[in-house]
Curated annotation (Swiss-Prot):
Gene3D superfamilies: 1.10.20.140, P-loop containing nucleotide triphosphate hydrolases. It comes from Salinispora tropica (strain ATCC BAA-916 / DSM 44818 / JCM 13857 / NBRC 105044 / CNB-440). This is tRNA dimethylallyltransferase. The record marks S117, R138 as: Interaction with substrate tRNA. ATP binds at G26, P27, T28, A29, A30, G31, K32, S33. Transmembrane segments: none annotated. Monomer. Residues 51-54 are annotated as: Interaction with substrate tRNA. InterPro entries: Dimethylallyltransferase, IPT, P-loop_NTPase. Coiled coil: none annotated. Catalyzes the transfer of a dimethylallyl group onto the adenine at position 37 in tRNAs that read codons beginning with uridine, leading to the formation of N6-(dimethylallyl)adenosine (i(6)A). The keyword Repressor does not apply. GO terms for biological process: tRNA modification.
Length: 319
């Protein structure tokens, strides 16, 4: 953060309305974490993690989780809360995140909800009721998944709910099964269960991004740094803790590819290159999700005075 940004933060922070949640969103490698720390200092805030993979203990290098020093004294909530064997639950995350937000607000501070997992952010900020589950139906669908594979079930989902199919990867069997379960239970599309646009909290959202060529370059540099920092060794350690059996954590970018290398399915060079390619594909999907939300004000993370610009967005919107 520049001296100009720091001065702007000190001047602007006091104008934030009480009870407002600040969202900092955007694609992987765009600069959300650094901006959130600077904003937290300017606004007397605390960060609530909304990155689905940073919820897992030990997934540090591959998720670019900030170190204690990089957090610069800013409290961070909902990091390292689950073992790598725990399946992700948006409903459980919603409960934990709202409890953290409420606690921060009760202490008169500003919650900053920060991450690139769009559904997690919306589940906190908006009114979202989770459909129930049926163990018998779930067991049947999971048996079909094991027999026919995710691609076949994805085609079935495409026939009954094309919008959901467009937002779920053909290889993500767990989410495909859940979507089909909701369709059968409710008789309505899975997308009908997405958060209602009505707000749960008063909020203002800032998105950070930069042009594709520069972001692609950042991604390549980030993956190079991950390898240099010991991603392979970290994945080996996590494999001993059951990472490969973790239905969610095993799909984390970088870890998924290194697990395939450790299993002999890829060379290390292939795992490295595939991590870059997979991250770039993931960024395209993140952009598609976030760009549909007109409430997000987008800023160029490569621009000068980013923190001051973000505060100029936050201040009037939060009054």
């Amino acid at each position: 953060m520049s001296a100009v940004d720091a001065a702007a933060g000190a001047a602007d922070g006091a104008h934030l309305a009480a009870g407002t949640v600040v969202g900092v969103v955007g694609p992987t490698a765009a600069g959300k974490s650094a901006l959130s720390v600077a904003l937290a200092h300017a606004l007397d805030g605390e960060v609530v993690n909304a990155d689905s993979m940073q919820l897992y203990r030990g997934l540090d290098i591959g998720t670019a989780k900030l170190t204690t020093d990089e957090r610069a004294g800013v409290p961070h909530h909902l990091l390292d809360i689950w073992p790598v064997t725990e399946p992700a639950s948006v409903a459980e995350y919603q409960r934990l995140a709202r409890a953290a937000v409420d606690d921060i607000l009760a202490r008169g501070r500003v919650p900053l909800l920060v991450g690139g997992s769009g559904l997690y952010l919306r589940a906190v900020l908006e009114r979202f009721e989770f459909p129930g589950t049926d163990p018998v139906l779930r067991q049947r669908l999971e048996a079909e998944l094991a027999q026919a594979g995710p691609a076949a079930l994805h085609e079935r989902l495409r026939a009954v709910d094309p919008d959901a199919a467009a937002n779920i990867l053909p290889g993500n069997g767990r989410r495909i099964v859940r979507a089909l379960e909701v369709v059968e239970l409710t008789g309505a599309p899975f997308t009908a269960a997405l958060p209602d646009p009505s707000p749960y909290y008063r909020s203002v959202q800032v998105g950070v991004d930069l042009d594709t060529a520069r972001l692609d370059e950042r991604i390549a540099l980030r993956v190079d740094r991950m390898w240099a920092d010991g991603l392979v060794a970290e994945t080996r350690l996590l494999a001993d803790q059951g990472l490969a059996e973790g239905r969610t954590a095993s799909r984390a970018l970088g870890y998924q590819q290194v697990l395939r290398f450790l299993a002999g399915e890829l060379t290390e060079s292939e795992a490295y290159q595939e991590t870059i390619r997979a991250t770039r594909r993931f960024v395209r999907r993140q952009r598609s999700w976030f760009r549909r939300d007109p409430r997000i004000t987008w800023l160029d993370s490569a621009g000068s005075g980013l923190v001051a610009e973000a505060l100029r967005v936050v201040r009037p919107a939060a009054r």
